[in-house]
């Protein structure tokens, strides 16, 4: 593994962004959405950056980069079209032991930013380790079509009730079974309809069942008997250690 994957909490943390063009704009959008305090060093601002500056959403430090600017920031992103300037920022970050990402220049990065599928609290990061960014973006597009938008709603409701479920079901296996069953129930349908009240009622109903970890046996047809034809549902039952019988 060439890079260590992680998700960073940037809420109220200062970060430095070098550049104020279109590429830097996309970086700034994601940083702001994560709650970061974005400091921008650039000679000029494009209209979007200017609007953010006028609204107090970013701090514009002007166009002169000084190494001391790195002292108080969490990390720096170099997103200009000036390769010499980007290298200068990276080398300064190395001296100050600060993480630096230089857009589209893997050898000037101490960290990389993955392609992300964003479904609210649920986020999936895809990275090629800087070797093939277009391939990572391609797979992001594919995965985005597989994960419905209401997955984020499901995750938010689950997060709200997680502690209650933990208090009610003190066994890890019970809790895992409960969540697996819930996410396959009408709970997902209600979440897709943005009917939060109905989704929570479904959660409460299942949680209040007298035997939430009751027994279950599954009978599955396996066609010609090829194990590669086992359905996803059967594989999930195996993970939950539910006895399964196949008909050949």
Each language-model region and where it sits:
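Short loop/edge segments at beta-strand edges and connector loops
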Residues: 42, 60-64, 104
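Short beta-strand and adjoining strand-loop segment in the mid-core
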Residues: 35, 39, 73-83, 122-130
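Glycine-rich, highly charged phosphate/nucleotide-binding loops
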Residues: 53-71
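E1/E1-like adenylate-forming module used to activate ubiquitin-like modifiers
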Residues: 100-152
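An accessory alpha-helical subdomain
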Residues: 130-211
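Glycine-rich, flexible N-terminal cofactor/catalytic loop recognition
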Residues: 3-48, 52, 67, 214-248
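Hydrophobic beta-strand scaffold residues
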Residues: 38, 60, 99-100, 245
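ADP-ribose/adenylate-binding Rossmann-like module
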Residues: 75-81, 86-113
């Amino acid at each position: 593994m060439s890079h260590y994957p992680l998700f960073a909490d940037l809420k109220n943390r200062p970060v430095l962004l070098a550049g104020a063009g279109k590429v830097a704009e996309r970086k700034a959008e994601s940083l702001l959405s994560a709650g970061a305090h974005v400091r921008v060093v650039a000679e000029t601002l494009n209209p979007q950056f200017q609007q953010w500056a006028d609204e107090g959403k970013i701090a514009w430090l002007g166009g002169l980069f000084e190494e001391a600017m790195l002292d108080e920031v969490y990390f720096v992103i170099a997103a200009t079209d000036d390769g010499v300037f980007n290298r200068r920022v990276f080398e300064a970050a190395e001296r100050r032991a600060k993480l630096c990402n230089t857009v589209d220049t893997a050898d000037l990065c101490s960290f990389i930013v993955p392609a992300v599928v964003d479904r609210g609290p649920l986020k999936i990061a895809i990275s090629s380790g800087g070797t093939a960014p277009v391939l990572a973006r391609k797979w992001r597009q594919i995965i985005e079509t597989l994960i419905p938008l209401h997955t984020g709603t499901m995750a938010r409701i689950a997060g709200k009730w997680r502690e209650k479920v933990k208090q009610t079901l003190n066994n890890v296996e019970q809790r895992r079974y409960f969540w697996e069953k819930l996410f396959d129930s009408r709970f997902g349908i209600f979440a897709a309809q943005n009917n939060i009240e109905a989704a929570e009622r479904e959660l409460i109903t299942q949680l209040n069942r007298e035997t939430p970890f009751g027994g279950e046996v599954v009978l599955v047809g396996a066609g010609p008997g090829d194990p590669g034809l086992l359905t996803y549902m059967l594989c999930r039952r195996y993970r939950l250690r539910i006895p399964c019988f196949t008909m050949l």
